[in-house]
Every structure is written in C-alpha cells, then in structure tokens.
Amino acid sequence: MTTFSPREIVSELDRFIVGQHDAKRAVAIALRNRWRRQQLTGPLREEVAPKNILMIGPTGCGKTEIARRLARLANAPFLKVEATKFTEVGYVGRDVEQIVRDLVEVAIGLTRQAKREGVKAKAEAAAENRILDALVGPTASQATRDSFRRKLRNSELDDKEVELELTSSAPAGMPMFEIPGVPGASMGAINIGDMLGKALGGQRGKPRRILVRDAYAPLMAEESDKLVDDEALVREAIREVENNGIVFLDEIDKICAREGRSSGDVSREGVQRDLLPLIEGTTVATKHGPVKTDHVLFIASGAFHVSKPADLLPELQGRLPIRVELQPLTVDDFKQILTATEASLLKQTVALMETEGVTLTFTDDAVDALARVAVEVNSSVENIGARRLQTVLERVIDEISFTATDRSGETVPIDAAYVRERVQDLASNADLSRFIL
C-alpha cells in the first residue's frame, strides 16, 4: 500500500492529468485514509468504513485517466471495471460478485510478484544450476562447472540450445467448460486441462529444447514458485483485498433506469440492486475462500449525459457519499494537455516521427490553433473532451506521417497557418455528417 501523502498523490497525478483538482484531492484523501486506518488498533479499526466516491463529469475530462494513474500509485489490489459488463443475478452474463473474484486474482498476482522478489537470489542460483546441469550434466567436475558458470554469466552461451524439463500449465488448446450456478468458480469456468493434469499426477515436466537466453525467465518463475508457500500467499492476498482493495466502477451512468420503463432492466436497475450489498459490505464466495468487502473502496464514475445522478437508486446514492464534479476542459487546458503533461500528445508525435528521421517542430501559435479547433469542434458537434485533440492532431500530421519515409533528415515546422489549412474542413464535415444517412 502506498505511503504517499495526499499532496504527493495529487502532484503525481498532476504529471499526467490537467486540471480536475477536486477529483484528484478526493481520490488522494481516500487513498491516504486506507493508510490511516491501518495505523488504528482494536475494534475502532474495524468500524472505520471507506468513504466511497462518485465522480461526475463530461466524457474526455479525465475520469478514466485518474483511475489508470491511481492503479499505478496505489500499490494495492486495484481493479477497473465497466458497470455495463454486468447483468442481474440469474441471467446469462457476469454478475457483480465477479468483481471481487477478479480483484482476488489481481491481489494474488501482486502478492506472488512480491514473494518472487523476496526469493529472487535463491531462485537465480537454482535456475543457473539447472542450466549448468543441462549444459555439462550433473556428474561434471567442479572445475568444468565453474568454467561454464563463468561463460554463462558473461553471456557467452546465450545462443546455445539446451534441453530442459519445464512444468507447463494447461495446454492453450484445452477447452473451458462453464458450469452454471457454481459460486466462486470464476464464472463457473472449469479448465479441463487443469483437471486432467491433476488426475494424471500433477504438472509433470515436459522436455523442451530452448535457447539459454530464453530459459532464464521460465526457470526463475518455476524455482521461485517452489520456494513460495501457495496457501500462505492466497491468505495474504485475500487479507490485502479485504483491507486495501480498490474498485473503480466506470460508466455507472449507463446502468441508470430509462425513463418511462416500469420493469427492472436486466443490465440496469437489477445491477444497481446487486451492487448495493457489495458496496455496503458482504461476503463473496470465491474459489480461494470467502472474501469480505466491508473495507473495499469503491470509486464510481459516469458522464451522466442522458441521465443524472438522482436517477441512480437512492440506496446506491447513499453508499457513494463523496460526490466530485469534474469540469469541462477549456482552451488553456487543451494547450496544457498538448505540451505540459509528461507524455503529452505533441511529445508522442515528435518521438514517433524521429524514428523516421523527421524532426517536427510546433510553434506556440500552432499549439494555440490546435487547442482552439478542438474546442470549436467539441462545441459545434459533440463534446468528447480531450479525445478530440487526437482527431485534430492526426488530421494535421496526416500528410507528414504518410510521406515521412521519403523525408528522412528533414525538419518540418508546423505553425498556425499549416494547422488551419489542414483542418479547415473538419468542423463543416462534422456538421454535415449529422444529415447524411
């Protein structure tokens, strides 16, 4: 779990996301509160429940990007899902409890990675010995082994082929069978390969010919897993989910009931009702054991173009007590998105063209023109936020991108006049497209 202060979390998000200070503050405080709760002792620690968040804002203003960046910062089990993927319990499709099962799998992956790091030195030594055994045989003299060990460490034997016995997981072609109504069996999907493997005496190694350089990764994973206690790992992963798990529930506005519909919708109101106990706190059966969701943090987000937050079930609104509104982006925001963020669109474009030997330069008035065109098209057609910049920028560099191979060594300056020339028909075409079937 991250130990960053709220200020540090916000400044880290600022590197990639322009504006939206209120949303950044809300998620930073929520993330820090996870750490604060861990410092409490006794019964009070169990009583402190996470304050779930509802982020409201137009499309393309940074809601999903905040989730992506938060996942890297959290250093805790984090899962981003779309609310539209789920259906009401009892119907064909994924039910909302699958969220917790997926979160447990994420936690197991994180915990396994951490455990592997802890035994890395021992695993490296074991992997090296297995490669040496394959190269010179287990009965070789110590002097021979030392000589080959030196060559191995100096990468002199990387292109040599060896035969190793690697334990393989189920073959890729083995089918998955769904068994309806099996709780916690990962949607009831049973891998026949796993079942056959266990019936035939476990995962026995299969001799494979492989280059020395390619052998290290599978051998390291195999030797690390031998040194890790799987049962303890799963217990630790479940504990991490229960105390530090974070679920980002995107597109929650799409599961609001349609006006004028009296019956519950399979993938709308029914899903909202199923989410209630999950967010409030319940116990979900998974194939690794029961998981409590009392202290899992839920961050929901939606554009609410057609519906409004009040259209959500009142009980669901009550379970998302912190409400944050994200602001539509302005011309200045667009200019910052183009230039100021760490992996800005202009930096990406310039770097891509440099691979062809073409040097692109954007003048300040070109950046201003790009931002203004994006805002104009958003206001006249459909507001898709920062995503509009990609449309405009691709239109501007389309010709350069197509002919870049023939222009190696050139420097291509892009100014406001060039931008206007390339995008002059964009807004009018977009307007006309409304009337063309």
UniProtKB/Swiss-Prot annotation:
- One Pfam annotation reads ClpB_D2-small
Output the GO biological process annotations, alphabetical, semicolon-separated: protein unfolding; proteolysis involved in protein catabolic process
A GO term from the CC aspect: HslUV protease complex
Principal subcellular localization: cytoplasm
Keywords, sorted A to Z: ATP-binding, Chaperone, Cytoplasm, Nucleotide-binding, Stress response
Cross-referenced NCBIfam families:
hslU (TIGR00390), PRK05201.1 (NF003544)
State the similarity comment. Belongs to the ClpX chaperone family. HslU subfamily.
Kindly state the subunit structure of this protein.
Answer: A double ring-shaped homohexamer of HslV is capped on each side by a ring-shaped HslU homohexamer. The assembly of the HslU/HslV complex is dependent on binding of ATP.
Indicate what this protein is called per its UniProt record: ATP-dependent protease ATPase subunit HslU
